[in-house]
Amino acid sequence: MRRALSLLARLPRLLLIGLVRLYQLVLSPHLGRTCRFHPTCSAYAIQAFREYGALKGLVLTVHRLLRCHPWGGHGYDPPRWFDEEHPAADGRPQAAEEQ
């Protein structure tokens, strides 16, 4: 019973990851590399869903997609919730307000 409940709780996250994987396999090869960030937006989405679950991961993914345009940012941008510290590109901790 516990195992079934655990799978049911993870199901939304797994479905969203599956949709991103489908995009990576079907559409992404035809669009070419257009993402300005590292990791790419689709890899970011998968990481966000794995680390934060379906709801927070979806919020982070939409926020990232809205920032990924020619006049937006670029560079290293790992998934992190809005009030968390995150490592700089060189691996040292860096608070969000320091950027």
Curated annotation (Swiss-Prot):
Give the protein's function: Could be involved in insertion of integral membrane proteins into the membrane.
Q: Where found, per UniProt? A: Cell inner membrane
Family to which this protein belongs: Belongs to the UPF0161 family.
Please provide an example of a Pfam family that matches this protein in its UniProt record: YidD
Which lineage?
Bacteria, Pseudomonadati, Rhodothermota, Rhodothermia, Rhodothermales
- Provide GO CC annotations from the record: plasma membrane
Keyword match Cell inner membrane: yes
Range of residues in the leader sequence: none
Membrane topology per the entry is: Peripheral membrane protein
Organism (species): Salinibacter ruber (strain DSM 13855 / M31)
- Superkingdom as given in the UniProt entry: Bacteria
What is the name attached to this protein's record?
Putative membrane protein insertion efficiency factor
